Design a protein with these regions (language model features):
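Short acidic-hydrophobic surface loop/beta-edge motif
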Residues: 9, 47-49, 158
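Extended charged
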Residues: 1, 9-10, 126, 165
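Short amphipathic alpha-helix that is part of the acyltransferase structural core
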Residues: 2-41
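Acyl-donor binding region in acyl/amide transferases
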Residues: 17-20, 62-171
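A short, polar/charged loop/turn motif at coil->beta-strand junctions and beta-hairpin connectors
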Residues: 12, 24, 55, 83-85
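Short non-domain terminal segments
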Residues: 1-3, 59, 169
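Conserved beta-hairpin
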Residues: 30, 43-63
Length: 171
């Protein structure tokens, strides 16, 4: 067998186009390509990551799922009545395929954050979680400028009799 490497046929992360996509397209992609196979119902803003007009990644943002975990970060005195909740988004789901080149995740996060800042200036910060039991320890988030606030044992998942793993928040 003979293999020829043609560097001009390889696409780089800088060629990716990031744009808002409809919820139904984002959700179908996430169900197919995210390790959990699940979407987050409160995700309202979805970015598609395209290379050569093909969808290769989706990032879904919404309000934080568990405000209780965030109280110490955004609310010290107001007992949950802090207006800062409207200044925050959570990156609820990120699903990418191998169609996209190396460093695509961090590049797409950076572009989506710039688009959010430009079009929704009230958003002051973005939160996300990395599930180290499935997809690493947050290296991509740190490479994108996120700050690691804590590492905790995930005791929120349990396995159903059919083998499916679900989060306790589903019940």
């Amino acid at each position: 067998e003979c293999f020829i490497f043609n560097s001009s046929s390889m696409a780089g992360a800088k060629e990716i186009i990031v744009k808002v996509i409809p919820t139904n397209i984002a959700n179908a992609f996430v169900k197919k390509n995210h390790y959990s196979g699940k979407v987050v119902a409160n995700s309202k803003l979805h970015f598609g990551c395209f290379l050569k007009n093909k969808l290769g990644g989706v990032m879904s943002f919404g309000s934080p799922l568990d405000k209780g975990k965030m109280l110490s970060l955004v609310d010290t005195n107001n007992k949950g009545k802090n207006k800062k909740w409207n200044e925050m988004l959570e990156l609820n789901r990120m699903a990418f395929t191998d169609l996209l080149p190396r460093n695509s995740e961090s590049r797409c996060i950076a572009i989506s954050v710039k688009l959010i800042k430009k079009n929704a200036p009230q958003i002051k910060w973005i939160l996300s979680f990395a599930d180290s039991t499935q997809c690493g320890d947050g290296t991509i988030y740190r490479a994108s400028g996120f700050k690691l606030t804590s590492i905790k044992l995930n005791n929120q998942l349990f396995e159903l009799p059919n083998g499916m793993k679900v989060h306790k928040m589903n019940f």
